[in-house]
Amino acid sequence: MRYNQFSYIPTKPNEAFEELKGLGFPLNKKNSDKANLEAFLRHSFLNQTDTDYALSLLIVDAKTDALTFFKSNSDLTLENLQWIYLQLLGFVPFVDFKDPKAFLQDINFPVSYDNIFQSLHHLLACRGKSGNTLIDQLVADGLLHADNHYHFFNGKSLATFNTNQLIREVVYVEISLDTMSSGEHDLVKVNIIRPTTEHTIPTMMTASPYHQGINDPAADQKTYQMEGALAVKQPKHIQVDTKPFKEEVKHPSKLPISPATESFTHIDSYSLNDYFLSRGFANIYVSGVGTAGSTGFMTSGDYQQIQSFKAVIDWLNGKVTAFTSHKRDKQVKADWSNGLVATTGKSYLGTMSTGLATTGVEGLKVIIAEAAISTWYDYYRENGLVCSPGGYPGEDLDVLTELTYSRNLLAGDYIKNNDCYQALLNEQSKAIDRQSGDYNQYWHDRNYLTHVNNVKSRVVYTHGLQDWNVKPRHVYKVFNALPQTIKKHLFLHQGQHVYMHNWQSIDFRESMNALLSQELLGIDNHFQLEEVIWQDNTTEQTWQVLDAFGGNHQEQIGLGDSKKLIDNHYDKEAFDTYCKDFNVFKNDLFKGNNKTNQITINLPLKKNYLLNGQCKLHLRVKTSDKKAILSAQILDYGPKKRFKDTPTIKFLNSLDNGKNFAREALRELPFTKDHYRVISKGVLNLQNRTDLLTIEAIEPEQWFDIEFSLQPSIYQLSKGDNLRIILYTTDFEHTIRDNASYSITVDLSQSYLTIPTNQGN
C-alpha cells in the first residue's frame, strides 16, 4: 500500500482539537501529549470495556506494549507514535513491517507529528490497510449514533444515517416529449432510495438505461457481421446543423398531491451511491425513455433521451410533474429534496451525465462521469470507418437500442408496442449508415461537444488510459472543450473500462465526499482538488498531479529511410482464424512474428519523454486501390514491470459504505513483469484523410501525405525504452474485415512521429 491522499483538508491545531472534542474524544490542552494519546486510544476501543487489555495488545516499540508504556514514566517519542499509528490503521508489526520509520517512508505516509491534535486529526482521515479511513471505521463501530442527522469531520459527511430505515419509492415523471407518437407525453420511472430524516437532502442520481433490464437475445440477433467490403465513397463535403437544445414547456399540475404509492425491495445499486446514502444523500436510479416501467422509444444518445433524465432533476426542483402511477391521477412532490443533484456512473451512465451537463439544467451541481462517451460517432466510428468498441466487434448503436429497450421484456408492453418499436428501430438502423462509416446529422445530434459551452456544473471525470471500449479520446475532447468558467477535475488511471472508487492507492471516495459536502450540502470546507491527477505508469500505487491533459510541445522522431509495403489480403485459413478470434490476431500483431501483414518500426529512445496528449503519425503513403484502411498502434515494447489493466481484489468485502452496509472488495491494479504495453492506437479511412467531413478520392499508386492522430494518453517513457510502431490495414477487433487484395506503401524516409510533451520535459 502507498498513500496518495487528495481529500485531507489542512486543519489548524485549535480547529483539530475542537473537531476531536466534538467527536467525543476526552482530550485536554493542559495534558501532556502522552496523556492525550492514551485518552484517544481508550476512547477508540468502542466495543471493549476492558481498555487495559486492548492497550496491552498494542506496542509502542519492538519490546514494550502500550499498557506498560502508559503506566511508566517514559516520555512519548516519535517512534512510539509511529508504531501506534500503523497499528491503528491495520498494519501488523513483524508481519507488515519491522522498522516503522522506513515503512512509513515507503508508503508515503502523509501525517506529521508536530502537534498532537493536528496529528491525531490527520490520522483519523487516513485510510487503513483495509481501505476505510480510521474515522469511518470508528463511526461504523459506534463512535456516533445513526441519528439521521448530519455530522461532519474534516469537511466530509459521516455515515450517521440509518440504512436499516430507508424509504424506497417509485414515481413516474412526465416529460414534454412523445417519442413513439402515442398521443401522450412520455413517462419516466424513477426508483428512489432515501434515508428517513427531517432534513431536506441532496440526491445522487444514476441515469442508467440498463437498470430496468437488458434484452441480450435481441441484441445478439441484431449484432452485425464484421466481414464485408469496404465501400469506395464518392468525394463530397458533409454538411450538418447544430440544433439548439429545446427547453421543455412547464405547466404546474392541479392534480391532488399524494405520497408515492409504489415501492420496491431491491435494485442493483452503485456502491459509490451507497457510500453517500449512509451520509445523507438520496439515491435515485432512472433508466429513461424506452425502458421497462417507462414509456416511449429508446432514442439512444440524443437529446430526447437526455431530456428524459433532465426532467427528473427538474422534478426534484419542483418544475415538472411526477405521478404516483401510469394512471396520472395523482401527483407526487419531491418535498424531501433540497434540489441539488450529483450524477454518477460509468460508460453509458457517465455518458448521460455529460449529456445532462450540456443542457445547463438548474440543480445539477456536480457530475462524476466515469469512462463517459462525449460523442457517439467516436464510440461506433472512427475517421470515416465503422469501428467497433474494443471487445465488441459487430456492435452498433441500433444493437445497443435492442439491448436497452427493456419495454419488450414486459409481455403486455411487447404486444401493444413492438410493431411501432420495430418501425422506429429500422429507421435508426438506416440512419447510422454502416455502409459508409461517415459522420452525418444523426451522429451530430448525438455529439455533446456541440453544446459543451452550456455546462455550468462542476465536473469530475475518471478514465482508463487502457480503455479501448470508451477510448481516451472521449474524455480528452470533452475535458479540453469545457468552459473556463467552471471547475473541472480529471482522474486518469492505468486500467481499462473499470470503476476506480474502490482502489487502495487513492482516496477517491473521500475526495468526492469533500467535494459534494461543499457543493451539495453547502459546507464551507475550503476543499481544493487538483485539475488532473494521473496514475504514474512507472511505479506501483503512485499518482501524480499535472496541469493539463495535453502537452504544449511536440517532439519529432523519424521513422526510417526506406519504403515498406503492407498487404491487406490473408489466405483463407488465416483470415478465418482472425475473424473467429480477434485476440489471436492481436497476439500475432504484437509479437511481430510475420503471421500478420504489418510494418514494424522499433524506435529506441535517446531521452526521457512524458507523453501527454495525442501522438500523430505524419506519413507519406500510396495505395494500389481506390479504398484502404490504415491502422496503427504504438507500444512500449520490451520486458519490464507494467500495470495489468484490470484491478484485482486486495481484501474481500473490507470496504464498508456505512455501518456494515453494502460492503465491497478493496481492489488495485497489479504491477507485474510484462513484454509490452499498448500506449495508443487508431484507424483511418484514407478517403477521410483530411478531416471527418471531407471525403476524397484515392488515386492508385499516387503518393500523398497524411496526418494521423492516435488516441491520447499520458505515459512516462525513459531513455533506452523501445517504442514500437505497428502499421497495418484491417484491425480484426475494430474495423470492417475486408479481405480484398490491395496494399499500402509507406515512405518511411518522408514520415515521422510527433510526441506531445510539456516544454522542457
Swiss-Prot record:
Alphabetic keyword roster: Aminopeptidase, Cytoplasm, Hydrolase, Protease, Serine protease
Class in the EC hierarchy, top level: hydrolase
A single cellular component GO annotation: cytoplasm
The enzyme's E.C. designation: 3.4.14.11
Origin: domain of life: Bacteria
Localization: Cytoplasm
Chemical reaction(s) catalysed: Hydrolyzes Xaa-Pro-|- bonds to release unblocked, N-terminal dipeptides from substrates including Ala-Pro-|-p-nitroanilide and (sequentially) Tyr-Pro-|-Phe-Pro-|-Gly-Pro-|-Ile
Predominant location category: cytoplasm
Active site feature: S347 (charge relay system), D467 (charge relay system), H497 (charge relay system)
One GO BP: proteolysis
MF (Gene Ontology): aminopeptidase activity; dipeptidyl-peptidase activity; serine-type peptidase activity
Pfam family name, one: PepX_C
Subunit structure: Homodimer.
Family statement drawn from the similarity comment of this UniProt entry: Belongs to the peptidase S15 family.
Function according to Swiss-Prot or TrEMBL: Removes N-terminal dipeptides sequentially from polypeptides having unsubstituted N-termini provided that the penultimate residue is proline.
Name of the protein: Xaa-Pro dipeptidyl-peptidase
Source organism per UniProt: Streptococcus agalactiae serotype III (strain NEM316)
